[in-house]
Amino acid sequence: MGNRLVGQRIVVVGGSSGMGLAVSAQLLRRHCEVLIVGRSRDKLDAAREALRAFGAPRLHQVDVTSEAQVQRLFEESGPVDHLVCTAADIRGAYELLPQLSLDALDRAIRSKVVAPILLAKHGAQRMPAHGSITLTSGIAAYRPRPKGVAVAAINAALEGVVRAMAVELAPLRVNAVSPGWVRTPIWKDVAGADSEPLLASMAEQLPVGRVGTGDDIADAIVFLLGNGYTTGTVLHVDGGHRLV
């Protein structure tokens, strides 16, 4: 299936770290033309170095919560076959309701719901009929925990967006991958120095006995990019988390 993507032009929003970086690496190995989009110039430059062995992605520094910047991104990017978005800013969003700040909630909603809508609004019209948009939701929509109200709501909302866009933007395909607990830098933001013990505890609770990796999620995203008969779908890659 990977051969179907050779030469395809793919924008990866959030492709400079975590799951997005793993996606970028897999796509470069499949000889795709990859444009990595992110807010941080330092992270973009670091991603280029990390990916050097696989190819040379293009880089574009953009705040995807800004409609003007998203519009300019697609005006300057040239043709695009597929769009992937793994970006999320959930700093401060994992809190009990009395401590949840409106700023953190607004930031998380804008990064994970508003941004994908803006990307589709300005990107879909420039994409061919065989193209696709793949977003990332998350296990919190299905197995919420204390402090998870904001993230559960946001992931559930995003999956509604996916289904609606799959209808409205057809024949363009729109899907989501719903990761479970995955070892990415985001856990440093959530748990700080406690991130490793937390991940170890999570692994013990899962049927597969481990937390996920960026490549686990990248495999699923690449599948959705290449499968032309899948749309409006949420693909769960969660180590069996929904079963326990």
Model-derived regions, located:
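Conserved glycine-rich cofactor-binding loop
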Residues: S16-G18
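Conserved glycine-rich Rossmann-like NAD(P)H-binding loop of the short-chain dehydrogenase/reductase
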Residues: R30-A46
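Rossmann-fold cofactor-recognition segment
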Residues: L51-A68
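Catalytic loop of short-chain dehydrogenase/reductase
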Residues: D89, Q99-I109, V113, I117-L119, ...
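Substrate-binding pocket helix/loop in short-chain dehydrogenase/reductase
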Residues: Y94-L97, S101-D106, L198, M202
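Conserved Rossmann-fold SDR core element
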Residues: E159, E168-T184, T230-V237
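Catalytic Tyr-x(3-8)-Lys segment
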Residues: S195-D216
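C-terminal substrate-recognition "lid" of short-chain dehydrogenase/reductases
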Residues: R210-V237, R242
